[in-house]
UniProtKB/Swiss-Prot annotation:
Active site, per annotation: S1577 (nucleophile), D1695 (proton acceptor)
Motif (GXGXXG): 1548-1553
Positions with biased composition (Basic and acidic residues): 964-974
Alphabetical list of InterPro entries matching this protein: Acyl_Trfase/lysoPLipase, cNMP-bd_dom, cNMP-bd_dom_sf, LysoPLipase_patatin_CS, NTE, NTE1_P-loop_dom, PNPLA_dom, RmlC-like_jellyroll
Primary gene name: NTE1
GO terms for biological process, alphabetical: lipid catabolic process; phosphatidylcholine metabolic process
Membership in a protein family: Belongs to the NTE family.
Protein name, UniProt field: Lysophospholipase NTE1
Short motif (GXSXG): ranges: 1575-1579
Listed Polar residues bias regions: 311-327, 650-668, 936-948, 988-998, 1084-1100
Enzyme Commission number(s): 3.1.1.5
Length: 1883
């Protein structure tokens, strides 16, 4: 075991000594900095000793180390104590005792101070004063390429066919032409669907049957025969492929197209409809047998064809009458004749066509016997008397070959053709042939019974006696069905080109066929559906064919010839006894002025006061009243019942003996009158001095129902069914005594009984006094007509003329449910049944009730089954008897809803407007031409004017006016009252009495408890025209009557009248025979026209270029086509002589047509038979296309095979580029597209797509070529259209080429394409937006500013009209048709989206809109739910943003937040809406979020405004609080939507621009609103200041402060720099602009603003509409050399005046209609210079001091450079002066320098005075736009009329602001009242 050794004491001592040595060594080492190198041995020894000691004892080493550490610490403490107590105090002491001496002189101190000041200035300059440099936001760009690209909106939306396409799709597409079809109806057609295969080259005669052909697969060409005259020419020198075929290519039909003309379908539906109805259709009166059978006439030799022409004694046969040459033609031959007529080329006269039909001696013989003609060898004209024809052809009219046709030549104008119905039997024709020149009446068998009304021998009675012409059928079928073998082959009479249209398949083609039997079965099984199809076809005819022929092809004359033929066919004058017994004289006496007007009226007053006295005087010179004992006995013994049903009364109640008695004056030779009227010489009434106004108020039946007295409740809105009348119809002839049906249901007094006077109606006034009781109820009793009611007689004649009186097939079993049932809800529409393709689809609502479905309604008059006679008990007689002096204009071309004018006596001229006028008007009105059809019947039922009383001394110049307006008419008329200016007839014959005053008289009788008190308009009082002063040439009177015009309340124009406000208690009351008159202010009658008289101007225009198409005489009807088709009038209708007419308003005619489709069927029958072949060919080739929103119609570089006419909807033409798309133009209603490409045979230049669902008329180029061959005049018409289109594009390209070359997308079309907007949708951003209140204020603005020609629709209004199923799948087609109808009636249709996002109305509104207005709060830029809906719909319509603000201020940059997230917004508008609570700003104001101090200031402001308001009333014409209506933001928006904005463009000129402030002040004082502002240079600054808040005070202050800064020489000097780029740095200039504009963005400005600059980097002009305003205003003011160019995104911008100093074209491109352009530029010295070929500068310098030298005129280098820079600007300035709508204002401030800002006040005052003078001058001329003028001034009136608006006003109580302003103010007030009424009845 090992043991541990223990150290001895000696060893411990050694260890300790070693440790001590180690510590001492360590201490010495720490004290010394380094060991000595000389002692290595000692160190080694010490270390060895230490290690030895450590090795010896570790404890000793430890203690030794500790000891050394303690010692080292003590040493350190000693050192620190020494440093702190000795070293530091010594150092401090040394520093404190140190001294330094610095010596500086004053220059050194000044330099030091300046250095410090400059350093501080630089620090502030670049740190704080250049804050504007950091405002560099990039302008907002709009991604229009994405937004407007149709491929994005509707991929595959064009006609590309998918792989799953089949023939059923084509079939469904083709039958859309029939409108909406219910499922059983569709199945009925589909059940008969067949297919037919055509091999390439096969031909198909489209006239062989009436089947409906649809091309399913393949390609078919349609040909029409060439005219014989042109066929040879084409054969000799042909440009077509079909050189010698004799046919012309009309159309090329591809898959999905139709081959058949819709007229073939119409012919099936009208087989049993007669062309006209006469008394001889009744079985009681069998017509005489014809002299020749029809077949025998067709079998005669062709040599007799020229018999008519060879006969010098008779004029040629009327073509239309010859075409239907009964009396006993067979149906087959009638079909042949009609079909051949339809296929006769237009180049051949219609007479020649008849010759080709079958020219036999019998034809001519019968023709001669059927048409009495008078001849005169000494004259070049002949009177054409086709029995009862009511037309006189123009003697100078030529046929299509250019050769004057003998058809249009007649002898001297001796009498109207309708005088066959006059009481002169020697003018009456007969059935029997007579020798030439022999009076027909002298022949045996001629009928003279007055009951026959002279119509017994009319040509239409001839062929109607045989049942009327049947449907135009197939030529082949007619040949096969000819009876008795008397028919010669048609080839003997018709060349090959007359066979009709032929279809030829170019490739193997498959056709889908709906056979004719299917439509026949449809007619019998579903008559209501068939009626609907007829309506749709008529709609297509009117809206496509007639529209194209009239508006585009210039074939108005051809269309109106059809109306002339209809007048020839259906002429029904009044009974002859009315004329021969003095009825006409009594009627004329009715319009004489009242001689005893001072007498107070009583309840016994009647129209025929002192009638016996007049009768005694009249009978002295008139024929004694014919009568007999039977007459007396009949009148004395007959006791009519207490209630007389009108249908039970014959038209003329005379005995049979009386009927057979010839008038004693019938043998007297006709007396010549100046206008050819053969009036009997003994029937001239007493002479009169004037013709006064008035109305034939109540000639007989003054009952509450208008026609008869029953228990009908006038409070009912719709007529109730009457009791079933007797089988003896009113139109049925009567032999024997007058029947008196017994009616015990009432104890009232019949108006015909004469037992008691008519009760007085409250609220009405009369113009006549009642006479004795004997004449009260029988106005014609004293002249032998005791039961004659002229209103009923006129209505009977109108009913027969329009086909309403179709006789029943069986007189023993008349049907009384002859038309589809129309419920009350459908009748509320009060609209035409044919205006739209889907109009009056009553079966849609009825489909919800089985008993009203078109499937179950089997009794329909349209099918020809159960035709009942005309029963007036079914309708309310609304005929108005009116008088028009010679020269009056009843209807002007372009007017809608004119109504029917039945001529009682006199002549009406149907005039074709002058071609030059049309072209000029089209050029002038092209942007706004599609609203002309927006007219209503507001004035057609207007109140009639009373006969002038004794209160006016100038009654000699009383107007000859008469009109009616009852409350029911008001209720219907108010639907569209604001948008209609009324027909010419209404302006002449209604509401006004020339210069005469008016007096209220007691009512005639008591009506319903709430009779209307509607006052008639107080119109302009004009001097009588020359024609009116002549008086009635018929009776020799010299009554002076004014033919002044009148416009309804919303139109203030030439002779317009301002309608008085409706009485609040006015309700339903039939005022058919009540006259009304307003109380007019005396000052009205003292107003003198500013320009010429409209009637004289109209007469002058008529002399200048209007051509007469035909004349309408007695028994004729004017306005037939336009009224029944619901289109605007194609012609002017004027009074050729003093004329008395029966006027049937449009709304009354609409109700008749809704209940009796037979009227439309009769029209269809007549159109089938009488339309010229040219029109039929056009109709067969025109394609009616319905395209969906976004659908591409054609693309760029496609072949040009057709062009399009927009019927409804909107199209956009674009071209695609690398950086997006370029919008070229937008086309609205009435515009044509693509004809330039077709005519030039070039490829499409643009891509055309539909913005929304649209209707188009497509005209193929082949049709155009064919028409050009047949009608060369069309080529000229199209050439003019092309030339105008090219000229317009060239002018626009010149104007916009330099001005609109801006890189900002969307600026060129920012407002150019809003001029013809038709539909606008108001869509809220979120549901919290008060869109209803917004729409109400906007509608008020429309009414107050532009006349309210807009209708606002919301869901409730639409459902109220169309029912709760309006938005269902079934009702969509009906809704589309109704909306399209509204577009034609109104200038603007506004859809208000007031429903949830998911509703159908929201989507419908967006899809139907041309422009979408997104309405949101200005301080809430978040995306709303409706915006997401808008994006999902993918509409390509323009989208504009409306930001609502509670006050007129916009926080800077807030608008940018809206726009940067919505690149699809095209424009934005700031609108002030006081009381707005939905936004954050409005909530902050209303909830008290402001501090107490702000609240106190607001309260003080309100108190001050309230206290100052009483003083302001005497200073301003505005009585309402807030801004003027015309200056409000809503009015600005309304003008924007209608394209009537007023712009202000301010030019550049340095300090001379201070005159701009004076111009703005003058405009504000005159009340002219400023809707947009633009400027250049100093004009951009002044314009920007005004646009910021639209307030003059702040603008003036800020502009004056800027001028003060610029006038400071110190500031200018402080900004000088070394002139490398410019003389100044531009900082002071920038600072001055920024201080004036602040941080406002251009998009934040309240009024739309722009400024232009010149980009010298790219050498172009730029227009700025977004970004910081100060930057671009400064850039626009950058004068090169004085200020450095502004750098914007790398481009250098200088003064915009270098390119365009007055950017008028930019303002027009933004949508302004009128522009005030203010020029303050300097005028350069243009005097000649002469200084030789060389020039020494030294010589110039020396001679500048020589006063006799011309050296001062030598320009310097800066002058030469300045003139060079403004070369382009001078050219654009001259062009701007010539721009239409530009009011150029040159300010006389040339003497002031460019930098003369110190003369601010002088320049300002000079500009103000100059502006006032200019405005006064324009105001005196009537050219000054005010923002409140009616839009249809320019659209519908001539230059002489538009300025007379200033004379239309009512009394003004304020008495301030006289002259024009006073009148305007009152005009606005009156218009507002009318607008309120219209808004109340907007639907």
């Amino acid at each position: 075991m090992s043991q541990v050794p223990v150290a001895s004491p000696a060893s411990w001592s050694s260890v300790a000594s070693a440790a001590a040595a180690a510590v001492s060594a360590a201490t010495s080492a720490s004290s010394s900095l380094a060991a000595s190198v000389d002692e290595p041995a000692a160190t080694t020894a010490t270390a060895a000793t230490a290690s030895y000691a450590d090795e010896r004892n570790p404890l000793i080493a430890l203690f030794d180390g500790l000891l050394r550490v303690v010692l080292a610490s003590l040493n350190l403490i000693r050192i620190l104590a020494t440093f702190s107590t000795i070293t530091v105090p010594s150092l401090v002491y040394a520093i404190l005792h140190y001294s330094l001496t610095l010596q500086l002189n004053f220059p050194s101190l000044a330099l030091l101070f300046l250095t410090s000041l400059i350093s501080a200035f630089i620090w502030l300059r670049y740190r704080h004063l250049n804050k504007y440099e950091r405002l560099r936001e990039v302008p907002i760009t709009r991604d229009e390429g994405f937004n407007l690209n149709p491929d994005v909106a509707s991929p595959g939306g064009d006609n590309d066919r998918g792989s799953f396409h089949n023939y059923l799709d084509d079939f469904l597409q083709a039958i859309r032409i029939f409108g909406f079809l219910e499922k059983p109806v569709f199945h009925e057609l589909a059940r008969h669907l067949q297919t037919r295969r055509l091999v390439a080259g096969d031909s198909l005669s489209l006239d062989t049957d009436f089947s409906f052909y649809i091309v399913i697969d393949g390609h078919v060409q349609v040909y029409a025969p060439l005219p014989s005259a042109t066929a040879s020419a084409v054969g000799q020198d042909s440009v077509e492929d079909e050189d010698d075929s004799g046919y012309q290519l009309l159309n090329e039909v591809e898959s999905g197209g139709t081959l058949s003309s819709l007229f073939t379908i119409l012919s099936l539906f009208t087989e049993d409809v007669k062309l006209s109805f006469d008394d001889h259709d009744d079985p009681h009166l069998a017509p005489p047998h014809p002299a020749y059978p029809a077949m025998d006439r067709l079998n005669n030799s062709s040599a007799a064809n020229h018999l008519g022409r060879g006969n010098n004694a008779t004029a040629p046969t009327s073509p239309y009458s010859s075409a239907f040459n009964p009396p006993s033609q067979t149906a087959a031959q009638l079909q042949l004749n009609a079909a051949a007529l339809r296929n006769v080329p237009a180049a051949i006269s219609t007479e020649g066509a008849v010759e080709r039909l079958g020219g036999s001696a019998a034809v001519r013989s019968t023709s001669k016997s059927s048409h009495a003609r008078t001849a005169s060898s000494g004259t070049a004209s002949a009177t054409v008397q086709d029995g009862d024809t009511s037309t006189i052809m123009d003697p100078l009219e030529q046929n299509d070959d250019g050769v004057t046709s003998s058809l249009y030549h007649a002898p001297d104008l001796q009498m109207p053709p309708a005088q066959a119905a006059a009481p002169f039997s020697h003018f009456a024709p007969s059935y029997h042939p007579s020798p030439a020149g022999t009076p027909i009446s002298s022949l045996p068998g001629s009928t003279h019974s007055p009951y026959f009304r002279g119509r017994a021998t009319s040509i239409h009675a001839l062929h109607e006696a045989a049942g009327g012409p049947n449907t135009p059928g197939s030529i082949l079928s007619a040949m096969s069905s000819s009876a008795h073998g008397h028919y010669h082959p048609q080839a003997d009479y018709l060349p090959r080109q007359g066979a009709g249209t032929v279809a030829r398949a170019t490739v193997d083609t498959t056709l889908a066929v709906i056979p004719a039997e299917a439509f026949k079965r449809l007619t019998k099984k579903f008559p209501n559906a068939a009626a609907h199809i007829v309506q749709v076809i008529l709609a297509r005819l009117s809206r496509v064919t007639f529209h194209t022929a009239h508006k585009y092809l210039g074939l108005t004359k051809e269309v109106m010839r059809t109306e002339k033929s209809i007048n020839d066919l259906a002429c029904f004058p009044l009974p002859s006894e009315f004329y021969e017994k003095g009825g006409m004289d009594k009627l004329r006496h009715r319009f004489l002025p009242q001689p005893n007007s001072k007498r107070e009226t009583t309840v016994d007053d009647d129209y025929f006061r002192d009638f016996q006295e007049w009768t005694s005087i009249s009978q002295r010179s008139s024929t004694p009243v014919p009568g007999s004992k039977d007459d007396t006995k009949d009148a004395a013994t007959s006791s009519p019942p207490k209630v007389r049903i009108a249908s039970d009364l014959p038209s003329l109640t005379t005995s049979s003996k009386q009927s057979n008695q010839k008038p004693t004056s019938s043998r007297i030779s006709a007396a010549r009158t100046p206008w050819g009227h053969p009036d009997p010489p003994l029937k001239t009434p007493t002479a009169r001095n004037m013709v006064g106004p008035g109305d034939l108020l109540s000639m007989a039946s003054l009952s509450q129902d208008g026609w008869y007295t029953t228990g009908f409740d006038m409070h009912s809105a719709q007529p109730t069914p009457r009791a079933k009348p007797r089988s003896v119809s009113k139109l049925e002839p009567f032999h024997g005594p007058l029947p008196h049906p017994v009616d015990d249901s009432t104890d009232g007094t019949s108006p015909l009984s004469g037992a008691s006077p008519i009760p007085i109606r409250k609220g009405s006034s009369t113009m006549y006094h009642q006479g004795e009781a004997i004449g009260t109820d029988r106005p014609f009793a004293n002249i032998g007509l005791p039961h004659f009611d002229i209103k009923n007689e006129v209505m009977d004649c109108i009913a027969k003329s329009i086909g309403l009186a179709q006789a029943a097939h069986s007189p023993l079993a008349p049907s009384y449910q002859a038309s589809p049932h129309i419920n009350a809800q459908d009748s509320l529409l009060q609209r035409s049944v044919f205006k739209s393709a889907f109009g009056s689809l009553s079966m849609l609502d009825a489909a919800m009730a089985e008993e009203e479905s078109s499937i179950t309604g089997t009794n329909s008059s349209m099918a020809g089954h159960g035709h009942s006679g005309f029963h007036p008990s079914d309708f309310e007689n609304e005929v108005e008897i009116k008088f028009f002096p010679a020269g009056s204009t009843l209807v002007k071309a372009g007017e809608s809803r004119a109504g029917l004018f039945y001529v009682i006596d006199g002549f009406l001229d149907v005039l074709l407007p002058a071609e030059a006028n049309e072209l000029e008007e089209e050029d002038r009105l092209k942007p706004n031409m599609n609203h002309k059809s927006a007219k209503t019947d507001a004035s057609s039922g207007s109140s009639r004017q009373n006969r002038p009383g004794s209160h006016r001394k100038d009654s000699s110049s009383a107007s000859l006016r008469a009109g009616l307006l009852d409350e029911r008419n008001l209720r219907e008329a108010d639907v569209s009252l604001p948008q209609r200016r009324g027909t010419e007839a209404d302006r002449i014959s209604s509401n006004g009495d020339g210069n005469s005053g008016s007096v209220h008289r007691p009512a005639m009788r008591e009506g319903s408890s709430s009779s209307t008190s509607y006052g008639t308009p107080a119109g302009l009082r004009k001097k009588p025209t020359e024609s009116a002063k002549v008086g009635n040439a018929l009776d020799g009177t010299g009554g002076a009557g004014s033919s002044s015009r009148r416009k309804p309340s919303h139109v203030s124009s030439g002779s317009g009248a301002t309608t008085m406000p409706r009485h609040p208690d006015a309700t339903n009351s039939n005022m058919a025979f009540t006259a009304k008159q307003p109380v007019l202010h005396p000052s009205l009658h003292q107003q003198q026209p500013l320009r010429g008289k409209p009637s004289q101007q109209s007469s002058q225009r008529s002399k200048d270029g209007k051509r007469s198409i035909f004349t309408v005489g007695r028994g004729g009807i004017a306005g037939y086509l336009s009224s029944l088709l619901g289109t605007a009038s194609y012609v002017d209708i004027t009074a050729k002589t003093d004329v008395y007419v029966g006027f049937l308003p449009a709304h009354a005619l609409e109700r008749i047509m809704e209940r009796r489709p037979i009227v439309l069927l009769t029209l269809c029958k007549r159109l089938l038979s009488l339309l010229p072949p040219l029109i039929l060919h056009i109709d067969s080739s025109l394609d009616w296309q319905q395209v969906n929103a976004g659908q591409v119609i054609y693309r760029e570089d496609d072949p040009s095979d057709s062009f399009f006419i927009v019927i409804n909807g909107r199209l956009r033409a674009i071209t695609e580029k690398t950086n997006g798309i370029e919008v070229h133009n937008e086309y609205g209603q009435g515009d044509s597209v693509g004809e330039l490409d077709v005519i030039t045979n070039s490829r499409r230049r643009t891509t055309l797509h539909a913005i929304r669902d649209s209707e188009l008329a497509k005209m193929p180029s082949t049709l155009f070529n064919a028409i050009s061959v047949r009608h060369p005049a069309i080529t000229i018409q199209i050439s003019r259209i092309i030339a105008r289109r090219v000229r317009t594009e060239l002018v626009r390209s010149k104007q916009e080429g330099a001005a609109l070359g801006a890189p900002i997308p969307g600026l060129p079309d920012l407002g150019r394409n809003n001029l013809n907007l038709k539909t606008v949708a108001i869509v809220p951003v979120t549901r919290q937006v008060p869109v209803i209140d917004f729409a109400a204020k906007l509608q008020t603005a429309f009414d107050d500013t532009i006349g309210g020609r807009a209708i606002f629709l919301d869901q409730s209004s639409v459902m109220g009209v169309l029912g709760r199923h309006a938005f269902s799948r079934m009702g969509k087609l009906k809704l589309a048709g109704w909306l399209a109808d509204l577009e034609q009636k109104y200038r603007l249709v506004v859809y208000v989206v007031d429903t949830p996002v998911s509703s159908a109305w929201s989507q419908t509104s967006i899809r139907q809109a041309d422009c979408v207005l997104m309405v949101g709060f200005g301080d809430e830029p978040a995306m709303g739910e409706y915006e997401r809906l808008l994006m999902s719909v993918k509409t390509t319509a323009r989208k504009e943003l409306v930001l609502l603000h509670p006050e007129r201020s916009v926080p800077p940059g807030s608008t940018r937040e809206w726009l940067k997230n919505r690149p699809w917004v095209h424009a934005h508008h700031h609108v002030e809406m006081p009381g707005l609570t939905g936004s954050h700003a409005g909530a902050a104001i209303s909830t008290g979020g402001d501090p107490k101090a702000v609240k106190a200031l607001r309260n003080l402001k309100q108190k001050l405004e309230t206290s100052l308001q009483r003083y302001r009333k005497t200073m301003t014409p505005l009585s309402a609080s807030g801004r003027p209506h015309h200056a409000s933001d809503f009015a600005r928006l309304a003008r924007r939507l209608c394209g009537m904005s007023i712009g202000l463009v301010l030019g550049g000129g340095g300090a001379r621009g201070c005159a701009h402030l004076g111009v703005i002040r003058a405009l504000e004082e005159r009340g002219i609103p400023i809707d947009m502002v633009g400027g250049t240079s100093i004009g951009s600054l002044v314009g920007g200041l005004y646009a910021r808040e639209a307030e003059m005070v702040s603008t003036f202050g800020r502009a004056k402060r800027f001028a003060g800064r610029m006038a400071s020489l110190w500031r200018f000097a402080s900004d000088l720099t070394y002139p490398v780029v410019s003389y100044t740095t531009g900082h002071e200039f920038n600072r001055g602009v920024f201080k004036a504009i602040q941080e406002t963005h251009i998009e934040d400005m309240w009024i739309p603003f722009f400024c232009n600059t010149t980009n010298i980097t790219w050498s172009r002009m730029e227009v700025h509409t977004s970004g910081y305003a100060w930057r671009y205003i400064r850039g626009s003011m950058t004068l090169a050399g004085l200020i450095p160019p502004l750098v914007d995104e790398g481009n250098m911008l200088v003064d915009g005046g270098y390119v365009d100093n007055l950017p008028v074209t930019v303002m027009l491109a933004m949508g302004a209609r009128s522009v005030f352009a203010v020029d303050v530029g300097s005028i350069d010295d243009t005097s000649p210079r002469a200084y030789g070929d060389t020039l020494s500068g030294w010589w110039v310098l020396l001679n500048r001091w020589n006063p006799w030298s011309d050296a001062s005129k030598i320009p310097s280098i800066p002058d030469i450079q300045g003139r060079l820079t403004y070369v382009s600007s001078v050219k654009t300035l001259e062009e701007a002066k010539k721009v239409k709508g530009c009011f150029y204002m040159r300010m006389p401030v040339e003497e002031f320098g460019t930098l003369a800002f110190g003369r601010f006040d002088m320049i300002y005052e000079k500009g103000y005075k100059a502006a006032v003078e200019l405005l006064d001058g324009w105001d005196a001329e009537g050219k000054l736009p005010s923002g409140t003028e009616r839009e249809d001034f320019e659209d519908d009136w001539e230059d002489g009329d538009e300025y007379e608006e200033y004379e239309v006003y009512t009394d003004d109580e304020s008495g301030v602001g006289g002259g024009v302003r006073k009148i305007r103010k009152k005009r606005r007030r009156t218009r507002r009242k009318a607008g309120i009424s219209a808004r109340r009845n907007s639907i």
